[in-house]
């Protein structure tokens, strides 16, 4: 825990040297800082997305990040991720132990970051929204905060020194994330996923970087007409 508070300011400084950040919707972020359970649900483009969002949230409790197990195979990367609050999950294997651990921490007011797509989409477009974030939010009675991370590069991907825009959307209250009718569980989950997708798409539509202006091709120079000889 101590390493988290040592590393976080260092990472913040390094990140602000290498990239140019703009944060929008801080007032929406403040709504989850009252001790309530909350789940942060961002889109996912680059491996450093969780780090960028973590240094932006800078919560007084350590933010927990759900990350794929493969990222921990490198000893140095694994150490860094654990210090930053990341928890490894075995994808596709029904890792109920990790899910239960995160749910219990979330109930106690710890923020949980889960990428609802479950993987990166390098094009910047949203992939398929999965159910994991909603399962934990429903079990913990947590609010959900949609977050859109937008890279200001030509291809929409992360590059050194590019602009990065992190947009916090409007809170989705816990009451709207409860599965009230278990006989229609799949339909309820589909409704929630569509709601989150709509929120994330709207955040991009409202806050996308302006497309670079295309220079008009110069008009061909017209030669003076020759006068006719008598």
PLM regions: where:
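A transmembrane-helix-recognition feature enriched in membrane-embedded lipid enzymes
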Residues: 1-28, 59, 75-84
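Glycine-rich, highly charged phosphate/nucleotide-binding loops
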Residues: 20-24, 93-98
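Non-catalytic C-terminal accessory region of glycerolipid acyltransferases
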Residues: 97-230
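A secondary-structure boundary/capping signal
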Residues: 25, 67-68, 85, 115-117, ...
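Short, flexible loop segments at the rims of nucleotide/cofactor-binding pockets, characterized by
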Residues: 14-20, 42-43, 88-92, 123-124
């Amino acid at each position: 825990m101590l390493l988290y508070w040592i590393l976080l300011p260092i990472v913040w400084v390094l990140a602000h040297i290498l990239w140019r950040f703009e944060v929008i919707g801080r007032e929406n972020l403040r709504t989850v800082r009252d001790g309530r359970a909350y789940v942060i649900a961002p889109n996912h483009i680059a491996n450093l997305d969780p780090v960028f969002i973590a240094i932006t949230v800078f919560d007084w409790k350590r933010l927990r990040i759900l990350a794929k197990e493969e990222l921990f195979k490198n000893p140095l990367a694994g150490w860094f991720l654990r210090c930053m609050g990341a928890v490894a999950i075995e994808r596709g294997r029904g890792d109920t132990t990790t899910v239960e651990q995160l749910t219990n921490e979330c109930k106690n007011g710890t923020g949980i970051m889960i990428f609802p797509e479950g993987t990166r989409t390098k094009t910047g477009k949203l992939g398929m929204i999965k159910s994991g974030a909603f399962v934990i939010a429903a079990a913990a009675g947590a609010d959900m905060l949609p977050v859109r991370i937008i890279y200001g590069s030509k291809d929409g991907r992360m590059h050194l020194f590019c602009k990065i825009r992190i947009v916090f959307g409007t809170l989705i209250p816990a009451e709207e994330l409860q599965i009230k009718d278990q006989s229609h569980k799949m339909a309820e989950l589909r409704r929630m996923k569509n709601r989150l997708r709509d929120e994330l798409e709207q955040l991009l539509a409202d806050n996308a970087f302006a497309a670079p202006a295309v220079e008009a091709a110069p008009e061909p120079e017209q030669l003076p007409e020759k006068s006719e000889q008598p």
